[in-house]
Amino acid sequence: MNKAIPVLKLPVDFRLSLSIPQGDLYVSPDRGLVYGLRADAAVGDIVSKNHMVEMRITDAKTKRHTVDVGPGECDVLVVNPQGTISINSFTSSLIGGARSICVVGEEDLLVIPFTLVRGFKIIYGQPDVGVVISSPSRERVLKILKGLKPDIVIMNL
């Protein structure tokens, strides 16, 4: 069934600037996976599995491919189309006590609302490089949000 999802959409020309690490980049000496870092929340399946965090935001995909990272529990389920922050996802950042947020769609940009609303220190994967721990200022996050464009995305659910 097709659903209209209200979103804030990342403009194509904005993608390049957000592909640059937005915090401290950690790389393992052998260019393998990085393990054991601490943050308030993790965005991404592999990162969520390999680090100590209070909240996990996952979509069962890594590099756009389905991945099995073991049994997952979901306190909150949100719909978030690729390259967007859905209003549903933004609202989920306000829910206190959730330890696991499962995303139908893509979780990559959800670093933004969780940093803005909760001031979280967030860890996320930097593809083929390592992991980033980010705790940007409220001003930086608001600047990014101002660059997003309101839209409606039709998604088959």
Curated annotation (Swiss-Prot):
GO terms for biological process: coenzyme A biosynthetic process. GTP binds at residues 40, 59, 61, 107, 128. InterPro entries: GTP-dep_dephospho-CoA_kin. It holds the Pfam family DUF359. Its EC number is 2.7.1.237. It catalyses: 3'-dephospho-CoA + GTP = GDP + CoA + H(+). Pathway: Cofactor biosynthesis; coenzyme A biosynthesis. Belongs to the GTP-dependent DPCK family. PANTHER family: GTP-DEPENDENT DEPHOSPHO-COA KINASE (PTHR40732:SF1), UPF0218 PROTEIN TK1697 (PTHR40732). This is GTP-dependent dephospho-CoA kinase. It comes from Desulfurococcus amylolyticus (strain DSM 18924 / JCM 16383 / VKM B-2413 / 1221n) (Desulfurococcus kamchatkensis).
